[in-house]
Amino acid sequence: MVDHSTCRCARTVARLVPVIAGLLFLSAVRPVVAQESARDIVDRVDRLMRGNSSRGTVRMDIVTEHWSRAMEMRIWSLGTEYALIRVTAPQKDAGTATLKAGNDIWNYLPRVDRTIKLPPSLMSAAWMGSHFTNDDLVKESRIIDDYDIEIGFEGAREGIEVWEFELTPKPEAAVVWGRIVEQVRKRDLMPLWARYYDDRGELARSLRFEDFKTMGGRLVPTRMVVEPADKPGESTVITYADLEFDVPLDVSFFSLRRLQREAGSD
């Protein structure tokens, strides 16, 4: 019999992420030129968040109406298509892992020694019990292709020069959000926040990027906070403890065999 608490932990993943994998990758910033379009700028921001390869250690704190929990994880990523996320603490969840390869996601549940490929029906399920979904992990890498992008605001907000981008889905795009608004700091292309709206135009969740620090020789937002609009007081906070960039990884690292390794063996 499958331990449902373990399944919930494993089933339940922009920027990272949304979000988690995305923040592992940052590269050098060059100045923005005036003729760049909104799409060009968002594409550059996306590339800053998704370099060649990286690995890091993160802590995820989840607060819901009925419970709260903290988890520690190791993360490896290669480009936009590959990511491996392994829980290292608490001990009861250690070894639980998620592998992304292209559009496919597998979860490994060490308690029952079982690997599960997520079916389409579970793509909207919460990842690791958080306020992120499995679909976030797959779809975030295609934001430039799936959305039309315009600059909704350009100027100073609270003394900081920013862009605010309006993203609306293309007619043929199979996406969850009816609209996304993103704020980006001009001077270094650091994302400040994103707001996600449903197809009725109502705010569904918000994402904040905070605590900008230098890690691995690069400026990164080391803390992400996602809050669901319909659940006041609930949140998922992801905090980066360390990051390394341009590490030696190739596609063979992101295998089902690697997914099933014990925590601490990588």
Please place each PLM-identified region on the residue numbering.
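Sec/Tat signal peptide C-region and signal peptidase I cleavage site
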Residues: 30-34
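N-terminal mature ectodomain segment of secretory-pathway/periplasmic proteins
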Residues: 36-111
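Solvent-exposed coil/turn segments that connect beta secondary-structure elements
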Residues: 61, 76-80, 88-90, 103-104, ...
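Bacterial N-terminal signal peptides
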Residues: 15-28
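N-terminal secretory signal peptides that target proteins for export/translocation
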Residues: 1-13
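Acidic/charged, solvent-exposed loop-and-adjacent secondary-structure segments enriched in E/D, K/R, S/T
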Residues: 109-139
